[in-house]
Design a protein with these regions (language model features):
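Cys/His/Pro-rich metal-binding microdomains
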Residues: 151, 155-158, 376, 391, ...
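Short glycine-enriched, charge-decorated loop/helix-capping segments at active-site entrances
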Residues: 29, 170-177, 263-269, 451
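Alpha-helical scaffolding segments of alpha/beta enzyme cores, especially the outer helices
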Residues: 74, 185, 210-220, 236, ...
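Long, charge-rich, low-complexity alpha-helical segments
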Residues: 35-142
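Acidic, low-complexity/disordered tracts enriched in E/D and polar residues
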Residues: 1-50, 73, 125, 133, ...
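Radical SAM enzyme [4Fe-4S]-AdoMet core and its adjacent flexible, acidic
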Residues: 2, 12-14, 171, 245-247, ...
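Conserved alpha-helical substructure of the radical SAM core
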Residues: 84-86, 100-240, 244-247, 514-521
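Flexible mid-to-C-terminal extensions adjoining Fe-S/redox cofactors in radical SAM and related proteins
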Residues: 397-521
Length: 521
């Protein structure tokens, strides 16, 4: 006879929309989210009514939903296999054993099952969160920039108030930040609008004293959360974080060479500390990305981060399209952005999302739809700054409202600038989408706004990357050219000249941060 009693694991959370018969359900140790529709959605909805580690009787679910036990039994067996229910009460020992199994599986998967180039490319991707959002709508995802304070001083940081050398004065903390009561109210208001997931970032979120209170509030409310951090504030606290079951932790690692990483962070010993935290999180099976911006100082060694990720069962996340500061400092594009020759080589790395090669459709080019807005921020997702400004995303600092004084729903439904943004199409942009190289642009209206004070005018950063990718793709397609010259990526990177440190400094231009959109212009 099949088991009639199950338990809801402590590592699960999710949300059911009964009206739409749609449910999202997370296994927060494996880091996998599942989307359910129709009757299966309603069954998972019954599970979510039960507190974590609470008892679930199939007979009660059967009676509540008028579904036969014969139909429920195999479904619950599948849920048990996926770690979405447990056939026994979830003790601390069971959690530890499950973490150990998942951690070992993650490492073995990375080591024994290398992904093909096609599998790595970010085309035609779909996931449970997208499916749920498409079906239900509302505000489902929000990023909280908890503070711009940080335990590192990265030379490429785009945050307002960041410095480029130790003689410059940081103004990261020059703002009146939201309080814990503010966050609880805002989270409650967002939940009423459909919230299922939050990302906690900064600066570094653990530079915010109340971060653990916010995490506990999210956990108790059943909201999945990600954390983007350098790890410095997690020393001796990784188990504490793991016990709140983050959906994902992103750790910034810039090289496999400690001195290169520390040069970028401007904090001696930061590589060792971040790596120790990453190793501990890996052992605890906390889903993890290793985040790495590729720039001149680390171009010869950035690839080592992929090796580290493989050892830890993590996913490497590389960014080659570096952006200038939100407040108009041009230092990054002036001193740190890859040269044309360096960028051509790096774009042949299939770990790079902007990869150029025959495995990608049109060698990485994608035709832009002129009748749609090229950016999805500000529809179902937003960012909230440390002082409470509601903005489209962390790269796009135009203000739709001020949450210390306004209600989320009021801004979401009544803000004229937000309505204008949501109804924009690429046809209304001045240049974007009108050139042959635009197919190779990872168009960011936020970059446009930082540079020009409007999302409608093309930014130099966007165009630079698009033109390099376009030229490389067409030389490869039409001339048989390959910047690797028959060598491996790592061989070509090793042939690049060593980086010569230079004194970098702010180069301020216009500051358009935290202003409202100009409607119709």
């Amino acid at each position: 006879m099949s088991n009639d009693i199950y338990y809801r694991p402590t590592w699960t959370c999710g949300r059911c929309n009964a009206e739409k018969q749609a449910t999202i359900y997370y296994n927060l140790i494996t880091g996998i989210s599942y989307y359910f529709e129709d009757f299966s959605a309603m069954v998972i909805g019954e599970l979510l009514r039960v507190p974590r580690n609470g008892e679930i009787r199939m007979q009660d679910v059967s009676a509540s939903l008028n579904i036969s036990m014969e139909s429920l039994s195999p479904f619950f067996t599948q849920l048990d296999q996926l770690g979405l229910v447990s056939s026994t009460p979830v003790t601390e020992n069971i959690v530890d054993e499950y973490r150990t199994r998942v951690s070992e599986y993650n490492r073995l998967q990375q080591l024994s099952t290398p992904r093909s180039t096609q599998e790595k490319l970010p085309y035609e991707t779909s996931n449970a969160e997208m499916l749920y959002t498409d079906k239900v709508g509302g505000i489902t995802s929000v990023m909280f920039e908890l503070t711009y304070n940080c335990s590192e001083k990265c030379i490429h940081c785009y945050n307002i108030g960041a410095t480029r050398n130790d003689n410059e004065k940081s103004t990261r903390g020059n703002r009146s930040e939201l309080t814990l009561d503010d966050y609880k109210r805002i989270i409650d208001e967002l939940y009423e609008q459909g919230l299922i997931k939050v990302c906690l970032t900064g600066g570094d979120p653990f530079s915010k004293p109340i971060v653990w209170d916010i995490i506990e509030y999210l956990y108790n409310k059943g909201i999945a959360f990600d954390v983007y951090t350098n790890g410095q504030g997690l020393i001796n606290k990784t188990k504490k974080l793991a016990n709140y079951y983050p959906r994902l932790v992103g750790i910034s690692i810039y090289s496999g060479i400690p001195e290169v990483h520390d040069y970028i962070t401007r904090i001696k010993g930061s590589w060792d500390k971040s790596m120790n935290v990453a190793r501990e999180l890996s052992a605890l099976a906390v889903p993890m990305n290793l985040k790495c911006c590729v720039m001149r100082p680390n171009v010869k060694t950035y690839y080592m981060v992929a090796d580290i990720a493989q050892e830890l069962g993590a996913v490497p996340q590389f960014e080659v399209s570096l952006t200038d500061s939100i407040e108009g400092d041009k230092c990054v594009s002036r001193f740190l952005r890859l040269t044309d020759d360096e960028l051509e080589i790096v774009l042949r790395d299939d770990n790079i999302p902007l990869y150029v090669g025959k495995e990608a459709p049109n060698y990485g080019g994608q035709t832009k739809l002129m009748t749609q807005n090229p950016c999805g921020a500000g529809y179902n997702s937003f960012c909230i700054t440390p002082e409470g400004n509601l903005i489209p995303c962390c790269a796009f600092h135009t203000v739709f409202g001020y949450l210390k004084a306004q209600d989320v729903a009021d801004i979401n439904h009544n803000c004229k600038e937000l309505s204008y943004w949501r109804n924009l199409t690429l046809n209304e942009y001045e240049e974007c989408g009108r050139h042959d190289y635009c197919a190779y642009c990872n168009l960011c209206p936020g970059n446009n706004f930082v540079e020009h004070g409007t999302p409608l005018k093309a930014s130099e950063n966007n165009c630079y990357m698009a033109k390099i990718r376009f030229k490389l793709a067409h030389k490869m397609m039409n001339e048989g050219y390959d910047p690797l010259n028959g060598k491996t990526l790592r061989e070509r990177l090793s042939e690049l000249p060593d980086y010569t440190p230079v004194r970098i400094h702010k180069e301020m231009s216009h500051n358009f941060s935290d202003i409202k959109l100009k409607i119709n212009g």
